[in-house]
């Protein structure tokens, strides 16, 4: 299992379109991937779960992945969340 703290730099935060794109990125991997903010932890492959977090630019989340491609998964999710 691998964990990484990532600061969201997408200007509009995680609204519907960026969430859909993030779910597409996460769904490319076989690993179990979760995003955690405060006390909420949701499956990164779930649009509804991700929408419940209501994340904004500048917020920091913890992304965890467990599986054969966990390193690549976290690296690409970090790249996506850090894009401006």
Region locations from a protein language model:
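Intrinsic-disorder/low-complexity, polar/charged segments enriched in Ser/Thr/Lys/Arg/Asp/Glu/Gln
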Residues: 1-5, 60-62
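Generic alpha-helical hydrophobic packing signal
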Residues: 3-7, 20, 26, 76, ...
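Compact, glycine-rich, soluble single-domain proteins
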Residues: 7-57
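C-terminal structural segments of small proteins and small subunits
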Residues: 51-84
């Amino acid at each position: 299992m691998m964990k990484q703290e990532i600061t969201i730099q997408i200007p509009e935060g995680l609204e519907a379109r960026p969430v859909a794109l993030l779910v597409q990125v996460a769904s490319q991997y076989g690993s179990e991937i979760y995003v955690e903010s405060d006390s909420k932890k949701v499956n990164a492959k779930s649009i509804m779960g991700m929408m419940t977090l209501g994340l904004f630019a500048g917020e920091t989340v913890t992304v965890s992945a467990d599986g054969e491609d966990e390193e690549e998964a976290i690296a690409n999710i970090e790249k996506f969340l850090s894009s401006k």
